Regions:
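PLD/PLD-like phosphodiesterase catalytic module centered on the HKD motif
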Residues: 1, 6-10, 19, 23, ...
Length: 138
């Protein structure tokens, strides 16, 4: 387990995308248009390599701009978002992170883990939200 903060979180997400072989599951509390470009590129590169990428975004009542994501993505929207974002790779490693105080401009805090038992629990959380969200179609 490693604690990451601020820009280290984004570096960790990029590294995880580069290591992905089969799947990336993402619960993002921010929209793709708000993500750093290098994060969008990491997801796009993974998709191009044949990695299955599933993403859940908050339903904010606006059109979702996916123009920075190139490739194939399964995208869903939900009104029920956890305060922290989660990225799960190959059901082996995951990172949970968010602002130390929700809805603030404070420090980003995160925790990366490569423990399969905890990754299985993260997968259950993801699947529960995914199955109860709506399919996004542009």
């Amino acid at each position: 387990t490693i604690t990451v903060k601020d820009m280290e979180i984004f570096s960790q997400v990029i590294s995880m995308c580069e290591r992905a072989d089969t799947s990336i599951d993402l619960i993002a509390s921010i929209l793709p248009s708000e993500m750093p470009r290098n994060i969008c590129r990491a997801f796009s590169d993974a998709s191009t390599r044949g990695v299955k990428v599933r993403m859940i975004f908050p339903k904010k009542g606006i059109d979702l701009d996916l123009s920075r994501l190139k490739g194939y993505f399964e995208v869903r929207l939900t009104n029920t978002m956890p305060a922290a974002g989660i990225i799960l790779v190959d059901e082996k490693e995951f990172c949970v992170g968010g602002l130390d105080v929700p809805d603030s401009m404070n420090t980003l805090l995160g925790m990366w883990m490569n423990q399969s038992e905890l990754a299985s629990l993260a997968k259950l959380i993801f699947n529960n939200i995914y199955e109860n969200s709506e399919i996004y179609s542009s």
